[in-house]
């Protein structure tokens, strides 16, 4: 019973950290990354469709993304959607390929992005702690039902705390990595 609670908590904590990593991967750094355009939606026959489903996106070099649209008639719509996004990018069309050069980040913009990433990290930590609280509540319910003793209750709460500390440490290391990436010129 307690092992099930611990395993469930670990799975949920891992999902919290993975969600955090997914969020920060979309934060623009100085490097070109196809995931940068993940949030862009194109109006395709009346439906908003993710750009990734309508085009092939590759990092041509460290500062340029190349987008090859599957349907040539969509190229102008893709350009407009990229310009309309809040990413501050200016795509240029060259035949069938749309190139998106990434301008270098200013110091002020880097600091703003670090604040955003830190806020995301705090949200991730809160999520992990909420999972810990839920797991501890389940263990306390078992104690209240007299399914387990106080020693086992204390031991399992310590295990859950160690698990929480380990996942928060992983989250913090991902944060430090992203901060270093953002400050890299």
UniProtKB/Swiss-Prot annotation:
Keywords: Cytoplasm, Protein biosynthesis. It is found in: Cytoplasm. GO terms for molecular function: ribosomal large subunit binding. Transmembrane segments: none annotated. The keyword Isomerase does not apply. The keyword Disulfide bond does not apply. GO terms for cellular component: cytosol. GO terms for biological process: cytoplasmic translational termination. InterPro entries: Ribosome_recyc_fac, Ribosome_recyc_fac_dom, RRF_sf. It comes from the Bacteria. Responsible for the release of ribosomes from messenger RNA at the termination of protein biosynthesis. May increase the efficiency of translation by recycling ribosomes from one round of translation to another. Belongs to the RRF family. PANTHER family: MITOCHONDRIAL RIBOSOME RECYCLING FACTOR PSEUDO 1, RIBOSOME RECYCLING FACTOR. This is Ribosome-recycling factor. The lineage of its organism: Bacteria, Pseudomonadati, Pseudomonadota, Gammaproteobacteria, Enterobacterales.
């Amino acid at each position: 019973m307690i092992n099930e609670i611990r395993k469930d908590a670990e799975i949920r904590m891992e999902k919290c950290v993975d969600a955090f990593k997914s969020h920060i991967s979309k934060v623009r750094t100085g490097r070109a990354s196809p995931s940068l355009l993940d949030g862009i939606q194109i109006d395709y026959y009346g439906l908003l469709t993710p750009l990734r489903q309508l085009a092939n996106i590759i990092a041509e070099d460290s500062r340029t993304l190349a987008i090859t649209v599957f349907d040539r008639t969509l190229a102008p719509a893709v350009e407009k959607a990229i310009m309309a996004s809040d990413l501050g990018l200016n795509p240029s069309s060259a035949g069938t390929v749309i190139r998106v050069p990434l301008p270098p980040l200013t110091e002020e913009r880097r600091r703003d992005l670090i604040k955003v990433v830190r806020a995301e990290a705090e949200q991730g930590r809160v999520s992990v702690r909420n999972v810990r609280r839920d797991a501890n509540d389940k263990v306390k319910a078992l104690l209240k039902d007299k399914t387990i003793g106080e020693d086992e209750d204390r031991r399992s709460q310590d295990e859950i705390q160690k698990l929480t500390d380990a996942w928060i440490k992983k989250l913090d290391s991902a944060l430090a990595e992203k901060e270093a990436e953002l400050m890299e010129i």
